[in-house]
């Protein structure tokens, strides 16, 4: 018998809470895990409840009671067993220990703990599936609960000192617990009156910040529980590899004091002691080490600080050693001793290390980042960022800029309900106060005080902002004034968006004088009382100037048809017009504010971009009549292709070109073309395995299906006025055959992500217009009709949006729907100039009202559950709410989600095993289960072992005289591997293949693939370019083959295996050699050809001799 039953016969109107109270009178308090109260399909005066208990014993009890007559009031109840649980994997608390004393503080040696604060009568609970520890206690008549996730624990030690009546469980952490306080008034709401879910967010517990004096919880890097010596402690080894027991060893707990800077409300932040001055970069790194538990804050003594004196020690040596400390993977309790030993090692080598930082190209900058959580602060970086207009202009003061992100203790986004609880949407918690106060008061690091500057629209979505520390009379206000004139904007949301316009990641190209541009009229109409702008966000660029801009962007093989730009106060797209005589023709819809800046900044351009379906698109196409079998066929084709790349060279070559264009792909294609087999050459095999694994994972988690008959394209306008309403021009390039172009005619599906309304999917007619043949890799829309097609697609425009364009006729739906009305809500206009305090408050309010993810997930769940799919009432209502939420950064009008749109249970493909779940019968459920077993969450890729090194070394890569260059090659590879490994550790990326290809399976929660993939890719490319420049530093061109051969030798030969990244527990990396892939491929082809000719001659000689 299972844990779940159906109890029928309750009167209509009964709530889940009433059912729970009634059943627990028989089974005992806390025995009901989840309840769903539902109406029978035929209706009637009686309802039934599906009830999941914590134990099978309780289900038997209720079924037995019902068999012997069980009444609820006057209602006679029947009970039946149910096969499927409401929650497949409930998080059960199996262990609870009460009456403990808990110390908060820092471990300063393996046997000594310094306490900063302590709590009495603590109750700790944990169990299978929970993946977290709960600590509950009272302080000054308030009830508190700390929730510490397993991911924030890096080591647990149980100390049992001899002759003591207590033993001590020390939990060392790399992150703070979430802190809750209990509401004084009990609240009954959990998941709505018809559902109960015991492990849901108990509304009585409200998130709060560190309530101790000096923020001792946030300063603590370890928690120590004092346990009775006779207490049996559960075995933690199952969940923690770093669990150890120390019997009969000494263990001391001593009183300590706050070690964090008094200049900051944020903790922990350390300052050097009086009389010591550290450069900002070293102080920042030192704080990074303390905050990430690489160093113990109280253990930093004068001796340690003396070793950071760059007048006495080489700066590159200091930087290298501090960087290595970060990557050791453990806390160093004697940092002065460790540093001395490292210095001696390098000095004895007679060759100091190179700087651990990677040399960057123009357009890239190193930026420092600070993450603020409810209880702590984390410094990170410097990390590679694409530059922007402001950073370029103030490049002299780059270290005075700071990126600040507000995240939760698990480093994921703060939830809106943590700032404003569902029980009272008008209320604000202390988390809200903390975010607002940091924006208002700034952050102090050493002698710099960073103050709020601005944020871009993408930063706002990530809860991130820019800060600046005043220097040389330049302040944040000074920078905002330089950016442009915003005084005419009286709406806070729009004002903030215009400030952020200058912070878009971009590359500077050419200067354009005011007499070289023209302002041309917009194309607009009034239709049914609504003003539509067909040219919203788009202008023109002359063909000659476009070619110059392309060259400035480093594009030598083609000149794009359109560029996404920023120019002065203008933003949007400029498309090539062969007839234009002015460099730029801009429209009023592109002008957002006045600015004297005349530099043309480019954000993106039209190019080949592969096309993928996702869950939203599949849902809408399915709603509009595309059959399930079509989607299943498309997914199967992708999976078959991914399987084939591991063994078939031609399949691998084609798949890489279509699905993963880029510099890295060129290396792999070159290896295939020179004869290497996908399943034999270790580097090629590793990269292809990762490519397959990452694409399979995307299929499982996002249903992201590659469509060969489609492209992702930038939207443009037909400036010739040739196209009629309902027509588009679609011309695409072929990545496999550069220079080839193809014009599509016939029906095409056009949509813009995100898309939730069935009307967002447009079926248009692609036509051939010779006057528009210069427009390649973009979709050209007409300027005729009652409404612009881009506006019909999710309320989009032409300022840089990328559209899904598909000409695969199997995916053209048999019917379409009227598009939704995307007229934004009226904006609130102030009676005064917007103040920067109002912008800061708006930022905090955005987090409170950020509901995009909640609405999108709810839409996915309802569309799967409802018979009408995306046409159902809940989905249409959610689509409207989503539009309001999308416009919030422009209007300041929030989307309020009513209770009936909260998700009660999730389809299995959303993979929420700790929530009420059912097996989806619709297309996404089918696709998910078809690929689920082939795409586990983590797919292991074979490491380059000593055995593989012995078998795979290619003698064809040896060139006469390579031995002369081996020592230098070894030094360069050691430097390269150290930097590459540092990047992997910093971003939390496990394998070399992932960071090189961008097919990242899992990364640190500080980062997201969507937001940080470009920066990671640029950092890797910069490292490769730096390494290549070292190869080219000598002018001995005639010996470059021997030098390249040496690079291969120190990478692949078994005698060099395991000699790199000493003491850092890293894999043996292979990519170093392939930084000079063109030279290695040439060597391979030359030696292969020579060997084949020799073999042919030997065979011919054999025939001539022996017949």
From Swiss-Prot:
Its EC number is 2.7.7.48. Keywords: Nucleotidyltransferase, Plant defense, RNA-binding, RNA-directed RNA polymerase, RNA-mediated gene silencing, Transferase. GO terms for biological process: defense response; positive regulation of post-transcriptional gene silencing; response to salicylic acid; response to virus; siRNA processing; wax biosynthetic process. InterPro entries: RBD_domain_sf, RNA-dep_RNA_pol_euk-typ. Induction: By salicylic acid (SA) and infection by a crucifer-infecting tobamovirus (TMV-cg). The keyword Transcription does not apply. It catalyses: RNA(n) + a ribonucleoside 5'-triphosphate = RNA(n+1) + diphosphate. GO terms for molecular function: RNA binding; RNA-directed RNA polymerase activity. Disruption phenotype: Upon viral infection, increased levels of TMV-cg, tobacco rattle virus (TRV) and CMV genomic viral RNAs. Reduced levels of TMV-cg-derived small RNAs and CMV-derived siRNAs. Pfam families: RdRP. Belongs to the RdRP family. PANTHER family: RNA-DEPENDENT RNA POLYMERASE (PTHR23079), RNA-DEPENDENT RNA POLYMERASE 1 (PTHR23079:SF1). RNA-dependent direct polymerase involved in antiviral silencing. Required for the production of some small RNAs (mainly 21 and some 22 nucleotides) derived from the crucifer-infecting tobamovirus (TMV-cg). Required for turnip mosaic virus (TuMV) silencing and accumulation of viral siRNAs. Involved in cucumber mosaic virus (CMV) silencing. Required for the biogenesis of viral secondary siRNAs, process that follows the production of primary siRNAs derived from viral RNA replication. This is RNA-dependent RNA polymerase 1. The gene is RDR1.
